[in-house]
Each structure stands twice: as C-alpha cells, then as structure tokens.
C-alpha cells in the first residue's frame, strides 16, 4: 500500500452532533470502522488528507490507517458530503484483509466519439463488481468510438480488469447511441413550448 493512502486516525471518545461539529471544525472527519466481526470503532481522520485520497483514487479508495501505532487496511465504503458546503461530514470504513473479495460500485467513464449525427446517452453511471479488496479498479472505461445509431452497450459487454467479476444485471444498459436531434426537431420543440406558454394565459382569462 502506498504511503499516500496512509492516514493517522484518532479514536473518538466523544459522540453526538456537537462532538462531530467540533471534530470537523478541528479539521477531522468522524468515521466508523467496522467488519470481520469486530466491534465498530469510532475514529477521526484528517479531512484534508482524506479528501485528497478520494480525489486521487475515487470513492472506493483503500486506506492504511494508523490507529494508536497499529496499521489497519480499510476500504472507503460510504462518504456523506454536505449538500451545500461540499465538505465531508462522515465516512464508513470497512476492515479488509489481503486476498479478500469485496463488492463495490465502480464509476463508468465513456471515451471516444460516436459517429457523426449521433448522441451518446449514458444510462448507468456506475456498475457493481466483485474484486480483490486491494485491487479495486478506479473506473471502467467504455469506448464509443465510431459507434452508429442504435448501438447499445450492456453490462455483460464491459471489459473488466483481471480478477473482477460482474455483480450487476448482465442486461443492464450502460450506453445507448441514438440519433442527435436536427435543427428542425429543435425548432418544432421550441414552437410547441411557446404555444403551450401562450395558451396558458388565454385559459386563465377564460376562467376569470
């Protein structure tokens, strides 16, 4: 495990909303570490370093926690982000062991350009995989280079990294290539919208 994913975690002794606010004010993220039949451990991890790891390695980042001088490898299982201020409010961390398999949702990234006159619709932003806990892919790439209208890519067509297996429905639609709207289509939609807008005041006037 790279040192860049190492965090010094402090065991929490205070709980509740007030304690969580104080921790965040002091630059810490309240977290719970659980798994493998162990009692949950309540921790604080440094928010700046934790956020940097998530930016670099995604939401399934694997961490090496230093807890009272002892190392524990953990998977970032879930992160709660403040909807307005965009800071990390809380994290759930899962204890993992070497050689263990875990099920995670991995982001799907579309690459390339489809044929001229097409529009690429991505129907699934993530796909569920089972992978080695220490070798979780940060993303799955799907190339749409040169694809024509009517082409669909399903989950079972994804190229998965070695050791990873699909857990999602094999028929899950990932990408759908459709015809791009023409200028005439857009003008027609605009005209219909304007007609509906104009009709609304007329109907209100008739009722009054």
Swiss-Prot record:
Q: Where is the composition biased (Acidic residues)?
A: 185-195
Q: Which domain of life is it from?
A: Bacteria
Q: What binding partners and quaternary form does the record give?
A: Part of the 50S ribosomal subunit; part of the 5S rRNA/L5/L18/L25 subcomplex. Contacts the 5S rRNA. Binds to the 5S rRNA independently of L5 and L18.
Matching entries from InterPro entries are given as:
Rbsml_bL25/Gln-tRNA_synth_N, Ribosomal_bL25/Gln-tRNA_synth, Ribosomal_bL25_b-dom, Ribosomal_bL25_C, Ribosomal_bL25_long, Ribosomal_L25_dom, Ribosomal_uL5_bac-type, UreE_N
Residues of the region (Disordered) are: 185-208
UniProt keywords, alphabetically: Ribonucleoprotein, Ribosomal protein, RNA-binding, rRNA-binding
**What protein does this entry describe?**
Large ribosomal subunit protein bL25
**What Pfam families does this protein's entry cite?**
Ribosomal_L25p, Ribosomal_TL5_C
Ranges of compositional bias, category Low complexity: 196-208
Sum up the protein's function in the record's words. This is one of the proteins that binds to the 5S RNA in the ribosome where it forms part of the central protuberance.
GO cellular component labels: cytosolic large ribosomal subunit
Name any Gene Ontology BP term.
translation
Among the GO molecular function terms of this UniProt record, one is: 5S rRNA binding
Q: Which family does it belong to?
A: Belongs to the bacterial ribosomal protein bL25 family. CTC subfamily.
